[in-house]
From Swiss-Prot:
Keywords: Ribonucleoprotein, Ribosomal protein, RNA-binding, rRNA-binding
Entry annotated with the keyword rRNA-binding: yes
Task performed by this protein: Binds directly to 23S ribosomal RNA and is necessary for the in vitro assembly process of the 50S ribosomal subunit. It is not involved in the protein synthesizing functions of that subunit.
Name this protein carries in UniProt: Large ribosomal subunit protein bL20
A GO molecular-function annotation: rRNA binding
UniProt source species: Frankia casuarinae (strain DSM 45818 / CECT 9043 / HFP020203 / CcI3)
One CC-aspect GO term: ribosome
């Protein structure tokens, strides 16, 4: 059986890892072992943070909606409750965009929510 020489494969693997780590500081961009270790951590962080990004954006949207709703005299939870009662199905991303870029449309939605809240019966405390 012929002997398998793996020098080409090993060099390619090392070159790939060092290219991926090219922007890192110090030994992490120059030494294979340090670069490989850093790449393992980096990939773990990027995997985790791609999932965390969804929640971060939702939190940002809610903060923006709350600020705009309070400027119009409603809190976030009352505003969302009023929209739900009135049957308006606009997601938080669009609401946040309206709050930042189209204050007139957002104010109209606040009025719709306020009207729905006024028409709805108040829950009685048991």
């Amino acid at each position: 059986m012929a002997r398998v020489k793996r020098a080409v494969n090993a060099q390619k693997k090392r070159r790939t890892v060092l290219e991926q780590a090219s922007g890192y500081r110090g030994q992490r961009s120059r030494l294979y072992r340090k670069a490989k270790e850093q790449m393992l951590h980096s990939m773990t962080y990027s995997y985790r943070d791609r999932r965390a990004r969804k929640g971060d954006f939702r939190q940002l949207w809610i903060t923006r909606i709350n600020a705009a709703a309070r400027a119009n005299g409603l809190t976030y939870n009352r505003f969302v409750q009023g929209l739900k009662l009135s049957g308006v199905e606009v997601d938080r991303k669009i609401l946040a965009d309206l709050a930042v870029n189209d204050a007139v449309a957002f104010t109209a939605l606040v009025e719709v929510a306020r009207a729905a809240l006024a028409a709805a019966p108040e829950p009685t405390a048991a």
